[in-house]
Amino acid sequence: TSISAALGLAVARDLEQKDNTVVAVIGDGALSGGMAYEALNNLSILRKEKKNMIIILNDNKMSISENVGGMSRYLNDLRSRRSYSEFKENVENALNNIPGVGKSVARTLKKSKDSIKQLFIPGMLFENMGITYYGLVNGHDIYELIHAINRAKQHEGPILIHAITRKGMGYKN
């Protein structure tokens, strides 16, 4: 229901000619339900008018019952690419430790990689539905999340931020 409710809020925002940002947060378990697909399909309302709405997919591979179906398989495939993310972090760390030019080279490679990733990799399902895909984002890195949300706020049309999280890594008292 989060995406449906957010879509309603976004339409109301636009009718009232306001410019606030509407954000829906949905878990990977809930995304495999029919109501979520219906809402994703209806986002065409925002696509046509280039109106913004952000969806944050909290992907922790956890739900009350086992996830089944195409969306579950699709998300599992994306998660399995985590080894790629670890490799990427190791390369970035190595580059950042090169005196003088390392940080500049790392930044340039990261920008290039992000551009290529946005074009070809995991979010093609969402892209095919007209929803811009931004991910994979470390859901435990507040600065990475803030950066992703700020980029998403500048986007015209619906955008999904795919945040990978792990149970037990949340708020500590």
Please provide the spans of the model-predicted regions.
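Thiamine diphosphate
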Residues: 1-58
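Long, well-ordered, tryptophan-enriched scaffold segments
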Residues: 60-173
